[in-house]
Structures are given as C-alpha cells and as structure tokens.
Amino acid sequence: MSKAGSDVSSISCSLSLDSDSCEDEYYETNLNKLIENTSLNWIFVGGKGGVGKTTTSCSIAIQLAKKRESVLLLSTDPAHNTSDAFNQKFTNKPTLINSFDNLYCMEIDTTFSEDTAFKINKSDFFNSIIPELLQSFPGIDEALCFAELMQSIKNMKYSVIVFDTAPTGHTLRLLAFPDLLKKALGYLINLKEKLKGTLSMLQSLTNNEMEFEGMYDKINHLNTMSISIQENFQNPLKTTFVCVCIPEFLSVYETERLIQELTKKNISCYNIVVNQVVFPLTSPDVNIEKCEKLLKQIKDTNIQNSFNSLILKAKELEDVYISRRKLQSKYLTQIKNLYGNYFHIVCMPQLKTEIRGLDKISNFSEMLLQSKDIPIYST
C-alpha cells in the first residue's frame, strides 16, 4: 500500500470540477455535486467485484433522471446485474425502465462482437494486408470494436450516460484501449507513409486503387475516432469516474490501483462511495455489567437463567459488532487519510436486506445525497 499511497498525494486539485484551489474546496460527504453537474456526459462507476457497483450506478442514474432530460444506464459488466436490480429484463437495446419516462437501460456484450459494426474479417483487404498489426498489438481487435462502440455511444442523444462497469481488472483494460489504438494506428500511419511509393506501384499492378483508398480512409477514420474518444475521456467537464469500494483490504487496494491508473490517464475522479459500512448504533446504550448486578438481586432461578442466556448472547453480538467496527475503521482511516483532501467520500450503511427493486434502489439513491461523517471507531 505504501507506494500507491505515496502516489495519491500527487493527485492535483484539478480532479475536482468545482474547485479553484484545494484550500477553497469543501469536500462534502455526499454525491450532490456530481448529480448537480449538468456538463457531464459520461459517468463511469467502477471497483472490485461484489462491492455494490450496480446498486450505486443504478442509484446515481435515478437521481440524474430527476435533473437531466434523458439518462442512459449502460452495463458493461458480464454479469449484467442491472436486470436483477430492477427486476426487469434489459437487452443490448436501450429500454425504458419501468415507472420512468426519461431513464433507459441497456446491457452490452463485453466482447463487443455483437454490439458494434466492426468485425475482424480475414477476407477484408484492410486486415489481410496488415496481419502483423493484430499480432504486434495484442487486444487490438477488441480495442477497435471498443472504439466503434464508444463512438456509437457518443452519438446517442442522451443528456448523460452512466456506465456500470465490470470489476477493476476488466475496467483497466478498457481504459487502456485508447492508448493501444493510438499506438497501433500511429504505427499504421507511419507504415503507410514509408510504403507510399511501393503501394502506389502495387495499385497500378493490381488495379486495386479503390481498395487501397478504402484502407487509407479506414485508417484515418479509426484514428480520428480514437482521438475523439480519448479527448472525451480526458475532458473533466464531460467525463468522470466514481470509485466504489467496501472497507476491506482487497477492495481498498483495488480502489487505490484504479485511482492511480485514472490519474495517469488524466481521467477525472473525485467521488468515492464506500458501501457496507457499520455505523454506530442509534439505540440507547445498554450497560451489560449493570444488568448483571441487577440480575443477582432476582431470587427466581428460572428468570436468572433466562437473563444469563440473554446477556451471553448480547455479549457475543457486542463482540462481533465491536470487532467489525474496529476492522472497518482501520480501512476507513486509510481511505480518509489517502483521499480525504481530494475526494467526496460517501459512506453507505450496511443494510438489513439486499437492495433489489425500484423502491429499495430509490431509497438507497436518496441516502447518497445525505452527508454522513466517516465512522471511525474510538473506545
């Protein structure tokens, strides 16, 4: 953690869209500024698997639907939990979510093979003349499909799109695609310039002028598209990332890793949602020792035995509760120390039931807008 932790201190104030300087910015412990920021077009929600990304992205989309003209919730997670979350079947076509007139959802295949017009086709002249490209740049075929997909998403007429992303590792691969495309297409463009004379001769010999021109057009189109996507990713007025985690070692570690990659790629990130947090009990404190003293004054053995059993169970529950609070506080303290000066950190409580269905997601979404102190345990 130490190396990544030391790198976090280098994150500049520019990560926040709302501040002119670190000193002047107050980082609220809610997502109000994210929801109220009407300039954003793309909001990515990511983190380790099983930390509540889908619940958080659905909740953000619901709140945005109250402020924006049209909202699309787009799942790139292979598990596609959005259908389960809303108890409604979604496909790779935008579908209106029940009870809304401006909130849509779609689930796309993360291989991108069925969701884009781009296909790697061996008979295609563009691909057959440069097979080395696909070997020299592993993942370029998926990156090209991703570029086509993002371009089609960019052309969608929604006010804002919320991306429910796959777990961290897959998300980092997606974030690397624009750089991979830039490198691969730069190689192609240089190759085209170097072989211009040879290709012209080939054109006259093979009578393939139209195919060569088509290849040039395709390279230029992909290059323009790649630059456009990267510019959109790196524009903090249009794109931001919301990190989701829970107060446990692996989740905090992956969050740190994700934030470092986002920082390296100049992608805005100024919100962290910490789910499954155990907050202090709101019920009145019960002094178990005092209860034990009072119990000794009761002469009835049956009542004493019943209360003794109850006190033992209470002690067990208290031990579990305190242990959990202490463990979580260790990681909440790390989160606060690492990111407290640069991020809106929103702690969400551990709930009694799973969050499924519109009513429960709506309630959860309201809680994202309520400020809550980071609950560090102290004896």
UniProtKB/Swiss-Prot annotation:
Q: Which SUPFAM superfamilies match?
A: P-loop containing nucleoside triphosphate hydrolases
Q: Name one GO molecular function term.
A: ATP binding
The record ties this protein, via Pfam families, to: ArsA_ATPase
What's the EC number here?
A: 3.6.-.-
Keywords for this protein: ATP-binding, Cytoplasm, Endoplasmic reticulum, Hydrolase, Nucleotide-binding, Transport
Q: Which InterPro entries match?
A: Anion-transp_ATPase-like_dom, ATPase_ArsA/GET3, ATPase_ArsA/GET3_euk, P-loop_NTPase
Q: Give binding positions for ATP.
A: K48, G49, G50, V51, G52, K53, T54, T55, E248, N275
Cell compartment(s), UniProt: Cytoplasm; Endoplasmic reticulum
Q: Where is the active site?
A: D77
Mention any one GO cellular component term assigned to this protein in its UniProt record: GET complex
Q: What class of enzyme is it?
A: hydrolase
One GO-annotated biological process of the protein: tail-anchored membrane protein insertion into ER membrane
What does this protein do, in the record's words?
ATPase required for the post-translational delivery of tail-anchored (TA) proteins to the endoplasmic reticulum. Recognizes and selectively binds the transmembrane domain of TA proteins in the cytosol. This complex then targets to the endoplasmic reticulum by membrane-bound receptors, where the tail-anchored protein is released for insertion. This process is regulated by ATP binding and hydrolysis. ATP binding drives the homodimer towards the closed dimer state, facilitating recognition of newly synthesized TA membrane proteins. ATP hydrolysis is required for insertion.
Q: Give the record's subunit note.
A: Homodimer.
User: What family does the Swiss-Prot or TrEMBL record give for this protein?
Assistant: Belongs to the arsA ATPase family.
The protein in question is named ATPase ASNA1 homolog
Tell me the classification of the organism that encodes this protein.
Eukaryota, Sar, Alveolata, Apicomplexa, Aconoidasida
Name of encoding gene: GET3
